[in-house]
Amino acid sequence: MKLHELQPAPGSRKKAVRVGRGIGSGNGKTSGRGQKGQNARSGGGVRLGFEGGQTPLFRRLPKRGFTNINRKEYAVVNLEKLNRFEDGTEVTPELLLETGVISKLKSGVKILGKGQIEKKLTVKAHKFSASAKEAIEAAGGKTEVI
C-alpha cells in the first residue's frame, strides 16, 4: 500500500447536497423547505422546548428541591488504594494528591472501607467511615482527623 493508493472507507464520505439549483435536482425552488411558513424563512424554526404554544413540559412539571450552598464534596479514597504505600507511611491528603490517588482535594478527603488493607499506616484525612477506621486500626495503623 502506498500513500497515493489510500482511499476512504466505502460509505464514509457523502457528497454535499446542493439545494436551489433547478427543479430537476429534486432540491430546487424551495430547497427542500416546503412552502411558506416559519421553517421556510431564513433563521426560521422554533426554539428548543417550544411546543406550538402549548405549555411546555418543563413548565407543566413542578419545581423540586434546591441547591445547598453549604454542601461539601469530599475526594473519596477506598482502603484498597492505600496498599500502594510502604509500611509505616504517614498518608496525608497532599501525599494522595502527589501520587495521583486523588485528582483534586475538593472540600477534603474521606476514607471509605472498600477492600482490604494489609499495611500499617498512619492515615490523616478529614473524614473516615466507621468500617475504614476499624480496618486501619485492625491492621495496626492509626487514623487522625484533620
UniProtKB/Swiss-Prot annotation:
Xref: InterPro entries: Ribosomal_uL15, Ribosomal_uL15/eL18, Ribosomal_uL15/eL18_sf, Ribosomal_uL15_bac-type, Ribosomal_uL15_CS
Q: What residue range is the signal peptide?
A: none
- Locate the compositionally biased regions of type Gly residues: 21-35, 42-51
**PROSITE patterns, sorted:** RIBOSOMAL_L15 (PS00475)
- NCBIfam families, per the entry: rplO_bact
Protein function: Binds to the 23S rRNA.
Specify the protein name.
Large ribosomal subunit protein uL15
Q: Which organism is it from?
A: Geobacillus stearothermophilus
Task: Cite the source lineage.
Answer: Bacteria, Bacillati, Bacillota, Bacilli, Bacillales
